[in-house]
């Protein structure tokens, strides 16, 4: 891969003979976010290697420049060794020694000059390398700025993803709380409905019972009033009889007259207080009991005076009758008192039931309001669920898009070629047709099928260097051609793709027929056991890739 350029809108990849531009769909910055860390690492590694190279070059230059030329004076010429052994020949050899030293010095100067020229060349080479390194550093600096911008953009995208994850978590928590509230409200609503039904039944039965009891009490009151009127008449008669007997018992019946007067007053007060039953009934009962006592005393006195007052026998019988009637009235008053207490209890029960009914109505209104709020909350939760579903679909689509892009880049890196929505692999090895199909299958593809004139032209142009197997065969179905990838074979459209007099189904010396097809300029049937390069075809459905 010679070149790779990235920007926010497009990714362009070039090899020796093709370029592919990828334009992502949907959320574009996220697709570049995964490539940014790899590019940054590559740039950092290259920059580090270049810096190390420059440092070593400078060290080498410094070491070479810091070593000056030093004459090796400790090495004496062979002629000087004879100086100590032959003193007499010193004058004869002095001229020879000087010439020898001069030659050695000249040779060393020449060596120094050669070393200086080589050092100068190394310095020039290092300067040239330094210039190249500087230009590369500048280029890498510009690329590093672009990468930093992409990294910043990637960080923003990651922040947005984090915020989206937090929002999704919050929505899930709200959904769980709302579900629990809905479940609780449903239980409360069912309890309220059951309580309302029970209250209605109780109110209905209580109302019926109260109506019946009130009806019975009304009749009892009417009967009591009639009996009281009768008692009043009886008391009036008794008063008349008492006034008649008062003259006969003037001396001996003073106490009886006072008691009868007390009874008369008590009966009158009882008659007046019968209109207000709650308070006067108690007073009337006490007066009646008191009258009963007086009547009993009167009866005893009358029994004691029976011998003396034979003329008053009729009065005694009437008094006994009145006494019996008063006892009956007392019993009826006791009954009326109990009935009134029962009526008061019923009234309190009715009031309590009415308050319970009012409270139930209030609770029903509250439950209705809660139900409306629950419905609104349910609608809101449904909307949030729909929004969450849309976000999940968008994330899934983005993941699928990223996966497809990675597949495309991987195929391009493996020398697959893109054309018109499909990827093609042109092999350099040679295999029989069946082995070639196995290889294509192992790559998730099949031997290529041809369905259009443009695809035929593309294969012809790419396979011009030699014959290549394609996925057309009639093996096992002689004369009925089919594509191995399942694509329907269009015989009429494919007639122009065959070579002259092809297919001819030639029989080879080994008896094998030509049941498979290879292509160079046109199609030709060939024995399937022959070895040729092949063309694999893989459909990806990637619509955003374009051939540059």
UniProtKB/Swiss-Prot annotation:
Disulfide links within the chain: 440-536, 516-528
Presence of keyword Glycoprotein: yes
Record topology, Cytoplasmic segments: 1-42
Membrane-side (Extracellular) residue stretches: 70-548
Membrane-related topology note: Single-pass type II membrane protein
Expressed in which tissues: Kupffer cells.
Span of domain C-type lectin: 438-538
Record field: transmembrane: 43-69
Main subcellular location: membrane
GO molecular function: galactose binding; glycolipid binding
Matching InterPro entries: C-type_lectin-like (IPR001304), C-type_lectin-like/link_sf (IPR016186), C-type_lectin/snaclec_domain (IPR050111), C-type_lectin_CS (IPR018378), CD209-like_CTLD (IPR033989), CTDL_fold (IPR016187)
Cellular localisation: Membrane
Known glycosylation sites: 86, 92, 115, 132, 209, 255
Keywords recorded for this protein, A-Z: Disulfide bond, Endocytosis, Glycoprotein, Lectin, Membrane, Receptor, Signal-anchor, Transmembrane, Transmembrane helix
Listed GO CC annotations: plasma membrane
Gene3D superfamilies reported in the protein's UniProt record: 1.20.5.170, Mannose-Binding Protein A, subunit A (3.10.100.10)
PROSITE patterns (UniProt xref): C_TYPE_LECTIN_1, C_TYPE_LECTIN_2
UniProt-listed GO biological process terms: endocytosis; NK T cell activation
Function description: Receptor with an affinity for galactose and fucose. Could be involved in endocytosis.
Protein name stated in the entry: C-type lectin domain family 4 member F
Species the sequence originates in: Mus musculus (Mouse)
Gene transcribed to yield this protein: Clec4f
């Amino acid at each position: 891969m010679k070149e790779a350029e990235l920007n926010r809108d497009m990714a362009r990849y070039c090899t020796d003979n093709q370029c592919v531009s990828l334009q992502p769909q949907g959320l574009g910055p996220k697709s570049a976010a995964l490539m940014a860390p790899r590019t940054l690492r590559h740039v950092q590694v290259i920059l580090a290697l270049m810096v190390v190279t420059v440092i070593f070059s400078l060290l080498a230059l410094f070491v070479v420049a810091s070593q000056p030329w030093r004459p090796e004076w400790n090495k004496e010429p062979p002629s000087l060794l004879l100086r100590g052994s032959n003193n007499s020949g010193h004058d004869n050899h002095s001229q020879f020694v000087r010439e020898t030293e001069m030659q050695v010095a000249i040779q060393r100067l020449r060596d120094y000059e050669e070393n200086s020229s080589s050092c100068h060349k190394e310095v020039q080479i290092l300067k040239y390398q330094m210039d190249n390194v500087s230009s590369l550093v500048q280029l890498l600096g510009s690329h590093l700025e672009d990468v930093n911008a992409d990294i910043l953009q990637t960080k923003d995208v990651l922040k947005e993803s984090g915020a989206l994850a937090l929002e999704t978590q919050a929505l899930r928590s709200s959904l769980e709380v709302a579900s629990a509230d809905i479940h609780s409200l449903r239980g409360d609503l069912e309890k309220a409905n059951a309580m309302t039904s029970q209250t209605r039944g109780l109110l209905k039965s209580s109302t019926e019972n109260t109506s019946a009891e009130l009806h019975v009490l009304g009749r009892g009151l009417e009967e009591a009033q009639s009996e009281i009127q009768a008692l009043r008449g009886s008391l009036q008669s008794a008063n008349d009889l008492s006034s008649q007997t008062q003259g006969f018992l003037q001396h001996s019946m003073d106490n009886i007259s006072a008691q009868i007067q007390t009874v008369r007053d008590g009966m009158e007060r009882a008659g007046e207080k019968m209109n207000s039953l709650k308070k006067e009934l108690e007073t009337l009962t006490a007066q009646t009991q008191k009258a009963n006592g007086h009547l009993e005393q009167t009866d005893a006195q009358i029994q004691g005076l029976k011998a003396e007052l034979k003329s008053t026998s009729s009065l005694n019988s009437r008094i006994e009758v009145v006494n019996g009637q008063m006892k009956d009235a007392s019993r009826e008053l006791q009954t009326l008192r109990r009935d009134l207490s029962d009526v008061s209890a019923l009234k309190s029960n009715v009031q309590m039931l009415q308050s319970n009914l009012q409270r139930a109505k209030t609770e029903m209104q509250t439950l209705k309001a809660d139900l409306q709020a629950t419905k609104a909350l349910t609608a809101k939760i449904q909307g949030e669920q729909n929004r969450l579903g849309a976000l999940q679909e968008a994330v899934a689509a983005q993941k699928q898009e990223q996966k497809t892009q990675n597949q495309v880049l991987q195929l391009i890196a493996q020398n697959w070629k893109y054309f018109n929505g499909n990827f093609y692999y042109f092999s350099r090895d040679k295999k029989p047709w069946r082995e070639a199909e196995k290889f294509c299958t192992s790559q998730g593809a099949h031997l290529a099928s041809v369905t259009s004139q443009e695809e035929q032209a593309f294969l012809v142009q790419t396979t011009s260097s030699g014959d290549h197997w394609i996925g057309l065969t009639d093996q096992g179905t002689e004369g009925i051609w089919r594509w191995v990838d399942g694509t329907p074979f269009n015989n009429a459209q494919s007639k122009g793709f065959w070579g002259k007099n092809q297919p001819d189904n030639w029989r080879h010396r080994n008896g094998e027929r030509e049941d498979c097809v290879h292509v160079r300029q046109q199609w030709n049937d060939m024995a399937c056991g022959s070895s040729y390069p092949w063309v694999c075809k893989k459909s990806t459905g990637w619509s955003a890739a374009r051939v540059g």
